[in-house]
Amino acid sequence: MEFTESASLCWYTVHVRSRHEFKVLDRLTKAGIDAFLPAVERLSRWKDRKKLISFPLFPGYLFVHIRKMYEDMLTVLKTHGVVRFISLIPGEPEPVPEEQIMSLKIVLENKETVDPYPYLKEGQRVKIKKGPLAGAHGLLVKRESQHMLVLSVDILRQGISVKVDASDVETL
């Protein structure tokens, strides 16, 4: 792995132990690492009660915003619960495009209803031009006579979908 002294900050995907996403997020934050765990709230029901519970949108994964430097990567890897960085080439962590992280944050901050969506590479790339999701980029697809914006995280081969009005989007 090549390391540079003046490396800029990039987002990387980290694989974590099963059901340890929130604990690892807390540990990374306490270590001074900028970490992002896309999560959604779902209503869980038991026999005697109902409660809103936060669930990771991509179970087993979270994102870290670090420099591609030995010290930063080692700090992340030494964090209890972290398994490895996701990479296409062994030993070479694959950066996640800033646009994909920002689009996820825009959708999640606006409390839109999201559904996990299978990974898609082909399709029309669009940007939402107005409304609460303005600025989010993704793929426009049609499902059951409704238009959906699909935000894909390429490195994970996963994505999410959110309902949009087709008139609110423009092609890139």
Cite the ranges covered by each PLM segment:
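Acidic-enriched and Gly/Ser
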Residues: M1-K127, S145, V150-L151, I155-L172
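Short, charged beta-turn/beta-strand-edge "cap" motif at the junction between a beta-strand
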Residues: G131-A134
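Short beta-strand-centered aromatic/proline hotspots
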Residues: A136-V141
